Every structure is written in C-alpha cells, then in structure tokens.
Amino acid sequence: MRILIANDDGYLAPGIAALVKACEGLGTIDVIAPEQNASGTSNALTLNRPLSVFEARGEPVQGFRVVNGTPSDSVHVALTGLLPHKPDLVLSGINQGANMGDDTLYSGTVAAAMEGYLFGVPAIAFSQAEKGWTHLDAAAATARAIVEQVLAGGPPTGPWLLNVNIPNRADAASLPRLVTRLGRRHASEPVIRQTNPRGEPIYWIGPAGDARDAGEGTDFHAVAHGAVSITPLQVDLTDHAMRGAWASRLGVPLA
C-alpha cells in the first residue's frame, strides 16, 4: 500500500505531521505539501512560472517534499513526474477549520485530494471543524480509524473522493460517523475596506457567512450534533435536472 499525503496549510502545519504520524504502519508514505499556507486556493495550478521542490529537514517534517505552489500543484507534480510510482490512496489534511457545504469549492484541502481523484486515485480530505488545533491527536486517531475502515476490504479501487469533517473534541475517535451530503452557506460577509500607508484602498475578503442549509443529513448538521461527517464527492457539475428545461427554452435538442 502506497499512500500520498498532502495539505493546504503548508508543510510546517501541525495537521499534516499529525496525519502522517497517525498513518504510520499502513503502508509506504510519501508526503508533499505547499511551502506556504495556501488555504482557499481551490484547484488552482501554477502556470505562469516553474515550480521548485525541496526536501524538508528536521523533525517532524524530515523527508517531506515541499513545493512552492498550491495544494493542487503539489499532488499534480507528485503524480505526474516526481514519484516513481502511483499511490494507492491520496490523503489531504488535517486542515485547520471546517470544509463543509460550498466551502469545498474554495478548499485547498479538498482540492489536493480531488487532484488525486482526477488522476484515478481514491482520495480522502480531512478537516477539523474549528480552528486552533485543539484535540489534534483525537482528530488524527479518527482519520486513522477511517482509513483503516476503508482499507479493511483490501486496497482501494476507484476513483472515489471523501470529504471528512471532525469535531474538535477529545473524544472525536469515539463519536458516531455519518455519511452526509453537502449543506450550503449564505454568501460571505462584505469585504473589509482599509487604507494602506499610501492612502490607497485595500480590501480583505470577508469571513464566511452562516449556514443556510444545515438540516438533518447535511455535513453542518452532523458536526453540530457531535458526529463525524463523511461526504462522498464528485466533480460533475452538470445540472442534470435542468438539461431538458434549458433545451426547451433555447429551442435546441439535448445532446
């Protein structure tokens, strides 16, 4: 079993070291991660400059491969030229903060896992539901347990993609686990306007809005009620239910 582990918080983030440690003994582990925090970069690939890769030194990051790019860059480079073999499983995380609902569209953590999925490799993204790295060991133990469950039936076949959100609790490993669907948030809060020393306006992206679809069955509901959320994801963005309506409205046939 060969496992590739990545993240979006950067190679020095505690979450990736915890995930690597938790997965020891499950197979041969390769680690690749961005040099800097790349949260919110989604599936971006760096196309306007070359990428550099170096090997980190010192514990707990000894041997980690580090890329001066995005999470998707990291996994892409690993799968298309850096590694001499194709991994059997891609893991991403553990992220600091939830990736639920439409947050997943912006998430570098989910994107790193998705890059593996796009290359035909089964993948799992792991996130802690709140920031601060509290109870990280419990989250890592939960991630290990889920990976063990996945592997229990033999090497994964796929591709498939799971998005896992873990409550920040000391008892996370013993919490119920639910297969959920994505909820939805309100739009983000307004941008925050400030002025730089030259008197020019600058803008900070506002914080995420409140959940607006957080009913039973959603990832938001599961985490809020003390459960680990496991959401199967796919890449197909086609609105299949609306194809017929749009064909009729535009006066064109369905393909």
Swiss-Prot record:
The protein's required cofactors: a divalent metal cation
Species whose genome carries this gene: Rubrivivax gelatinosus (strain NBRC 100245 / IL144)
Subcellular location: Cytoplasm
Reactions mediated catalytically: a ribonucleoside 5'-phosphate + H2O = a ribonucleoside + phosphate
Enzyme Commission number, as recorded: 3.1.3.5
Molecular functions (GO terms): 3'-nucleotidase activity; 5'-nucleotidase activity; exopolyphosphatase activity; metal ion binding; nucleotide binding
GO cellular component: cytoplasm
Task of the protein: Nucleotidase that shows phosphatase activity on nucleoside 5'-monophosphates.
Family per record: Belongs to the SurE nucleotidase family.
Entry note: cofactor: Binds 1 divalent metal cation per subunit.
Positions contributing to a divalent metal cation binding: D8, D9, S39, N95
Primary localization: cytoplasm
HAMAP family cross-referenced by the UniProt entry: SurE
Keywords from the UniProt entry: Cytoplasm, Hydrolase, Metal-binding, Nucleotide-binding
Entry protein name: 5'-nucleotidase SurE
